[in-house]
Amino acid sequence: EQFSADLIRDTFKVMLQMAMVLTYGAKVPVVKVGRMAGQFAKPRSAPTEVVGGMELPSYRGDIINELAFAPEARRPNPSKMLQAYTQAAATLNLLRAFSTGGYADVHQVHSWTLGFTESDQAKEYRDMARSISDALDFMTAAGLDSERAPSLQTVDFYTSHESLLLEYEEALTRLDSTSGKWLAGSGHMIWIGDRTRQPDGAHVEFCRGVQNPIGLKCGPTTTAEDLKVLMAKLNPENEAGRLTLIARFGAGKVGDHLPRLIKAVQQEGANVLWTCDAMHGNTIKSSSGYKTRPFESVLREVREFFAIHNAEGTVPGGVHFEMTGQDVTECTGGVRAVSDEDLSDRYHTACDPRLNASQSLELAFLVAEELTQRRVQTAAKTG
């Protein structure tokens, strides 16, 4: 029920809004990659869970077992992989229809964003929204409207997930008849999680053998030497666009870890794209007992990520958020000021807390401001 057509549409809609705001702020194209159509396996820190004295296998995602704490529900069920595949295929078909059928029209996307800025809580973002309106009006006056420029009605949208359940990934791997290389058919981009990035591990071995773009989560325990080995294994040809490093440290800790990893990349002359996962390092247990992520901590980590790249002379290439198009109350803060007491109202996640639609769009505006400032500073330095 969490993957109905309406919920997929709403998440896609918010991602389009975020991408438009970021494109305006950065003045460069934004590649849109959604953790959709395949994100059914969950990494867990412990193999079992104890409730009321009963110990059962941990919930590992709907592709393996069920969330309900009962022996039958927690028993791994291979048929769930077939169900996950069917769901992923249906989701991908729906995303294709949304991205090419007119739903993604740039003017419609901006009208949704204007609706967000009309609220009193979001009034600080109205100036940027109006500037985007002016830019679109100029394009129309210059003859670049949706009728005369059909590309304004469509977007390129890609899917991604953690390549965790190798039995599933291997079953969907195909030999590309054009290139003669292996291709992971479960998604456009796959990534290796912080728990499975051992250089001699099975997940690294699988990912290095496929030609898809690969993401690599880099956490506080990632050493410079391990990163060098992983870069050589995953991108031996040093190909542009092949390897994305996804930094996940937590607010207040980015400065302790990111600079040494940047230096390791520079020492190797490695061609990578740096992105910021500001979610996983900022998970806390609220006073009300719910696992949550404070909006302020997420924003702080993003700003630290940008500041360090500015100091190192490197490029911050992307942001990675766990989000939904639903009006959930799973992360605290934001323009609607979700509090600890509000979390129980609409806490729907089965695993990690997600940003809701307004929090996600607000973050996009704030990141766009960072991108604008960076662009202005760069222009000033180059004269």
Model-derived segments and spans:
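Non-transmembrane, aqueous-exposed alpha-helical and coiled segments at domain scale
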Residues: L227-L230, L234-P236, R242-W274, H280-E330, ...
